[in-house]
């Protein structure tokens, strides 16, 4: 495997696949990194029992001349190179241009009982199920916000789960207003109608959210607050996710400027997806949640721009802008109810890695001070779960990224050419 | 239907489809993947490699994310719960 690529793409989801394919079609030598064992990302995650959608199969099969580097996690940033860890060891991969297609993760908000086994994200359970997690005959409650809940419920049902209900926190009026807007997006309307048809018979409730999960060693029942009052459902699994948050850790470590439209940053890019760092581009969710269509278009655009074909990228802009408007429509209509920010009580664990409760974090106004005093954010997830939740809860923003981006082996750290000085990451 | 893979989870034999994750194989046996620092049982949360709640020992290697690891024939998985 070469140690240098003209274009290195991080993330093999729809954006990264399009970027790699486009750059390779222009004759560039392209490497496509992903921490997962197979390309596809989250939305096109491989399903062990069902065939992938045609678009996913096409995107993966089109990768002629691209080195797909699966099971490769980025650990740190070097000079025009990334330090990566793979099962066979660690190495440095240099690049001419770097395309960040790092995607998004689910927003997971703490509530009493959320650490019980059997409580997962909504997209989380969908991903687990596609990879063989046993759900056949299991009673599943799906909750949270956004159309992802419907997609997750659909996958669960196809794998034999008994979906007891879908509990959407957005009120019925705004979900209906969103549905009316779909007439401007015929393809989406058809997709939504198909989902609703397949989910016929599954209750879809609005203005409803999970207050608490109960159980001894695993979730057994959940309390759901609805406009009509509180109800308790017995279940085997609870899948609850509140939308998506861009993965920006690598971009932050590279020094790329961030934009804040709310509590969570996304990578700041110009019309041609250039970040504030020369030669580094960001495509898809990393640049703000926009969905699958945006990811594919921006991936292609970044592949064009990174290889010097800006005219081809410009040609995709009108279509991209239109799809970005759909993303804005989604975030407006599925904005989170303020009550979701006060679900956690004093004893609810916020940092699941270090078992830090909400009341232990009282009085802290920055992540670093909280970390030093309570260990909040010092565990293996490096604050991805608790830091993001605390930012959403309005406590304090997450600290900037510092190496290693993910927990790494000592041998990998020993191989870093530029050892991270703590001073450089202490912040001002 | 895809081929089946046989592996061991805490000594119990498990059979799952090829391409399945170690997390899926464990879930056939137990919902306890690891113990938290205060000794509470934990299991996968995010399903996509972010939360590290699913980390287990795979073929002698500790702290492997079960949700990101594909099963292989004869694999030995040990949970920490």
Regions found by a protein language model. Name each.
Chain A
Residues 2-380, 384-427:
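Residues forming the flavin
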């Amino acid at each position: 495997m070469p140690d240098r690529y003209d274009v290195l793409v991080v993330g093999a989801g729809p954006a990264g696949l399009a970027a790699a394919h486009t750059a390779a079609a222009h004759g560039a030598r392209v490497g496509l990194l992903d921490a997962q064992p197979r390309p596809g990302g989250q939305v096109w995650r491989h399903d062990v029992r069902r065939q992938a959608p045609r678009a996913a199969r096409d995107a993966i099969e089109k990768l002629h001349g691209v080195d797909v580097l699966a099971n490769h996690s980025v650990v740190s940033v070097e000079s025009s190179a990334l330090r990566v860890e793979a099962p066979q060891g660690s190495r440095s991969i240099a690049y001419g241009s770097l395309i960040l297609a790092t995607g998004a993760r689910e927003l997971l908000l703490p509530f009493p009982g959320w650490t019980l086994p059997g409580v997962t994200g909504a997209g989380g359970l969908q991903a687990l199920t596609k990879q063989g997690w046993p759900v056949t005959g299991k009673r599943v409650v799906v909750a949270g916000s956004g159309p992802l809940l419907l997609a997750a419920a659909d996958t669960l049902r196809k794998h034999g789960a008994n979906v007891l209900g879908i509990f959407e926190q957005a009120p019925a009026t705004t979900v209906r207003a969103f549905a009316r807007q779909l007439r401007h997006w015929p393809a989406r309307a058809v997709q939504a109608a198909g989902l609703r048809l397949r989910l016929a018979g599954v209750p879809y409730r609005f203005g409803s959210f999970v207050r608490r999960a109960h159980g001894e060693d695993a979730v057994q029942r959940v309390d759901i607050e609805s406009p009509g009052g509180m109800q308790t459902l017995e279940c085997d699994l609870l899948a609850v996710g509140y939308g998506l948050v861009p993965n920006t850790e690598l971009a932050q470590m590279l020094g790329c400027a961030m934009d804040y439209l709310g509590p969570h940053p996304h990578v700041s890019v110009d019309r041609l997806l250039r970040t504030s760092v020369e030669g580094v581009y960001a495509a898809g969710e990393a640049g703000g949640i926009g969905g699958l269509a945006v990811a594919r278009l921006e991936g292609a655009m970044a592949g064009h721009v990174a290889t010097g074909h800006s005219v081809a990228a410009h040609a995709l802009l009108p279509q991209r802008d239109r799809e970005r408007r759909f993303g804005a429509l989604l975030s407006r209509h599925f904005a989170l109810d303020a009550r979701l920010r006060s679900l956690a009580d004093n004893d609810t664990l916020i940092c699941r890695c270090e078992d830090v409760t909400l009341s232990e974090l009282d009085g802290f106004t920055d992540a670093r001070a909280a970390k030093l005093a309570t260990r909040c954010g010092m565990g293996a997830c490096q604050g991805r779960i608790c830091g993001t939740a605390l930012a959403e809860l309005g406590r304090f923003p997450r600290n900037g990224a510092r190496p290693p981006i993910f927990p790494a082996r000592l041998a990998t750290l020993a191989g870093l050419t530029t050892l991270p000085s703590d001073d450089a990451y202490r912040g001002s | 239907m895809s081929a089946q893979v046989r592996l061991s989870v805490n000594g119990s034999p498990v059979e799952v489809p090829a391409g399945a994750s170690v997390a899926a194989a464990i879930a056939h046996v137990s919902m306890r993947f690891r113990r938290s620092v205060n000794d509470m049982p934990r299991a996968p949360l995010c399903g996509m490699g972010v939360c590290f709640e699913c980390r287990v020992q795979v073929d002698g290697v500790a702290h492997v994310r079960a949700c990101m690891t594909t099963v292989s024939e004869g694999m030995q998985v040990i949970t920490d719960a």
